[in-house]
């Protein structure tokens, strides 16, 4: 780079042009500059101090002081108002979410108790339309359809000996008689029960009658509950009702059945679903029965069958379990053609290529036994305020969330909906789902299913679908064994192992024998209590638990189909036990 024409560098460290300044002069200049800077800083500091003093004087001035005091008072007043408003809001929130629901429930229980007290009768004078009100004993009202255990802690259980009480379920009265397919529903005010009375052994496609009863829970002198029957209806009108499901409704019972006089396999092979019947039986002896054709039935289903297990009355709607065969080229059949659900037991998985297992799981929905129809679960939903005009619809869950359709039960516990599905296909374990409905005023309602992973025991099955099989395959097997949840299920990690339920299982992997009462967690059985002798033949079981809130005792009624060597092939027996929880 070319040197600058304005500056040249000399050996004596001076710069040109301009006068030459020696080192001593430079030091003097630096000293003067520093003194000047310090002086400016000192003057600035003095000015700041003076201004602060003036500000203090102004603050101490009476006028400004009064203004500041007024502002402070207003701020304090506003703060007090805000605190008061927040307090009121907290009281409102607590009242709406805690106090009011408890008060309403208490008032409801008191009202039911008062009705039970004043609704009495004498021989000549009665102040009620019936002799005994349709109201459970007050000790049980608030312990029905509630989770017995609210926490997620670890508990131990013991099942007491069966309590001696009169059976509310009649048996067959001849060696050739047959009573089968019990369905039981316990509501807050009363209970409903039904079973099929088959006239020719247990061939339910021939001729049968339907037994229906309703009653209340009362306390015996021994201190434990008894199922007191108040009304009985025996439907003997020539209609062969099958697979009936029962539900408690206000002032009575609702029952969903289908009518058929042919084999179940023939129903699936057909193209038009059998007649669907909805029967309403009230405490004043009124019986109303209607043929229903729920939306979504015609053109989609070859057959539709009630789920046998009980339904529920929920949010002014009547909900029953159902299942059946879907026509392959129907709208529903095309929509669900590729849907399947393949649960896996992580403690005992099925080996093989995943794609192959998925294909086998899909094929399991189309068993050849049912003419290769897709066997699908569903829910019959009827608006209660339009029940006399039977405004019902079929709500169909996705097969990506459920296994092959089968018998089932809808449960309502602590305002939470659960669905039991019989393990009729290849999956051998108990099938229980949490469910939630989305109802619409117009258009199709929907339901979401959330599977609860249970691996504690298996049901008996035949052929390739025994209790030991865990791999997908097409079959129709298993048996109806519904459970009763004792605790709410939580999806939160780490606490699901303390989900408990009880029921009656059949302790065999291949044969319907050895009825056994149990309490179970998700992955292991906690208690086993065999009923009867080893090898006793049995079939369907349904379980309901409730609590005596007077002394906190927990009772469960296990209704079981047991073999009978005296009257008929089966005797339906309600086994009442006390469940101890520690």
UniProtKB/Swiss-Prot annotation:
Keyword Glycoprotein set for record: yes
Q: Which cysteines are joined by disulfide bonds?
A: 178-202, 192-253, 244-257, 350-471, 382-392, 465-475, 545-556
Question: Which residues make up the annotated site Binding to the glycan motifs of the host receptor?
Answer: 180, 242, 264, 323, 369, 407, 422, 512, 540
Where are glycans found on this sequence? 284, 329, 400, 448, 507
Top-level enzyme category:
hydrolase
A GO BP term, please? symbiont entry into host cell
Q: How is it placed in the membrane, per its record?
A: Single-pass type II membrane protein
Cellular localisation: Virion membrane; Host cell membrane
One Pfam entry name: HN
In its UniProt record, a GO molecular function of this protein is:
host cell surface receptor binding
This enzyme's EC code(s)? 3.2.1.18
Q: Where is it chiefly localized?
A: virion
Q: What's in the keyword line of the UniProt record?
A: Disulfide bond, Glycoprotein, Hemagglutinin, Host cell membrane, Host membrane, Host-virus interaction, Hydrolase, Membrane, Signal-anchor, Transmembrane, Transmembrane helix, Viral attachment to host cell, Viral envelope protein, Virion, Virus entry into host cell
Transmembrane: is it a keyword of this entry?
A: yes
Would you name any one GO CC term?
Answer: membrane
On assembly, the entry states: Homotetramer; composed of disulfide-linked homodimers. Interacts with F protein trimer.
The family assignment reads: Belongs to the paramyxoviruses hemagglutinin-neuraminidase family.
What does the record's free text say on domains? The C-terminus (head domain) is involved in binding the cellular receptor.
Q: What functional role does this protein have? A: Attaches the virus to alpha-2,3-linked sialic acid-containing cell receptors and thereby initiating infection. Binding of HN protein to the receptor induces a conformational change that allows the F protein to trigger virion/cell membranes fusion. Binds to the glycan motifs sialyl Lewis (SLe) and GM2 ganglioside (GM2-glycan).
> Which protein are we looking at?
Hemagglutinin-neuraminidase
UniProt organism field: Mumps virus genotype N (strain L-Zagreb vaccine) (MuV)
Gene it is expressed from: HN
């Amino acid at each position: 780079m070319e040197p600058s024409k304005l500056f040249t560098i000399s050996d004596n460290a001076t710069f040109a042009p301009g006068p030459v300044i020696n080192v001593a002069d430079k030091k003097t200049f630096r000293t003067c500059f520093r003194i000047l800077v310090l002086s400016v800083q000192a003057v600035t500091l003095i000015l700041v101090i003076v201004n602060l003093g003036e500000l203090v004087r102004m603050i101490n001035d009476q006028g400004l002081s009064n203004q500041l005091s007024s502002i402070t008072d207003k701020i304090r007043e506003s703060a007090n108002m805000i605190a008061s408003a927040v307090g009121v809001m907290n009281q409102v929130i607590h009242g709406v979410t805690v106090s009011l629901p408890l008060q309403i429930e208490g008032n409801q229980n008191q009202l039911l108790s008062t009705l039970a007290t004043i609704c009495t009768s004498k021989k000549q004078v009665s102040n009620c339309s019936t002799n005994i009100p349709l109201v459970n004993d007050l000790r049980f009202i608030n312990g029905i359809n509630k989770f017995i255990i609210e926490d997620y802690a670890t508990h131990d259980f013991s099942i007491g000996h069966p309590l001696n009480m009169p059976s509310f379920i009649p048996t067959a009265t001849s060696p050739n008689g047959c009573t089968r397919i019990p369905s039981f529903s316990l509501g807050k005010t009363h209970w409903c029960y039904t079973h099929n009375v088959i006239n020719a052994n247990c061939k339910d496609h021939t001729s049968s009658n339907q037994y229906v009863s309703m009653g209340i829970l009362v306390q015996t002198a021994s201190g434990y509950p008894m199922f007191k029957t108040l009304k009985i209806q025996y439907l003997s009108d020539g209609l062969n009702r099958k697979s009936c499901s029962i539900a408690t409704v206000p002032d009575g019972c609702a029952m969903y059945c289908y009518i058929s006089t042919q084999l179940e396999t023939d129903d699936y092979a057909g193209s038009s679903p059998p007649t669907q019947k909805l029967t309403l039986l009230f405490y004043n002896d009124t019986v109303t029965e209607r043929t229903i054709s729920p939306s979504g039935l015609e053109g989609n289903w070859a057959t539709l069958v009630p789920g046998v297990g009980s339904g529920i009355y929920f949010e002014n709607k009547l909900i029953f379990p159902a299942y059946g065969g879907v026509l392959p080229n129907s709208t529903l059949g095309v929509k669900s053609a590729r849907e399947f659900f393949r649960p896996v037991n992580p403690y005992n998985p099925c080996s093989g290529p995943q794609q192959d297992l998925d294909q086998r799981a899909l094929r399991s929905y189309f068993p050849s036994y049912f003419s290769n129809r897709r066997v699908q679960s569903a829910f019959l939903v009827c608006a209660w305020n339009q029940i006399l005009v039977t405004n019902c619809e079929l709500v169909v869950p996705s097969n990506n969330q459920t296994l092959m359709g089968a018998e089932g039960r809808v449960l309502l516990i602590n305002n939470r909906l659960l669905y039991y599905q019989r393990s009729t296909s290849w999956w051998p374990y108990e099938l229980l789902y949490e469910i939630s409905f989305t109802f619409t005023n117009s258009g199709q309602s929907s339901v979401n299913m959330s599977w609860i992973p249970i691996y504690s025991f298996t049901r008996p099955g035949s052929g390739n679908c025994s209790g030991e099989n865990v791999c997908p395959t097409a079959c129709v097997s298993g048996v109806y064994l519904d459970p009763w949840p004792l605790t709410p299920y939580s999806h939160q990690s780490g606490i699901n192992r303390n989900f408990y339920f009880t029921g009656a299982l059949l302790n065999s992997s291949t044969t319907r024998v050895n009825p056994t009462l149990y309490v179970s967690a998700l992955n292991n059985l906690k208690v086993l209590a065999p009923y009867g002798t080893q090898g006793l033949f049995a079939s369907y079981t349904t379980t309901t638990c409730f609590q005596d809130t007077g002394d906190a005792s927990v009772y469960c009624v296990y209704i079981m189909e047991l073999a009978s060597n005296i009257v008929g092939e089966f005797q339906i027996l309600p086994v009442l036990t006390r469940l101890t929880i520690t």
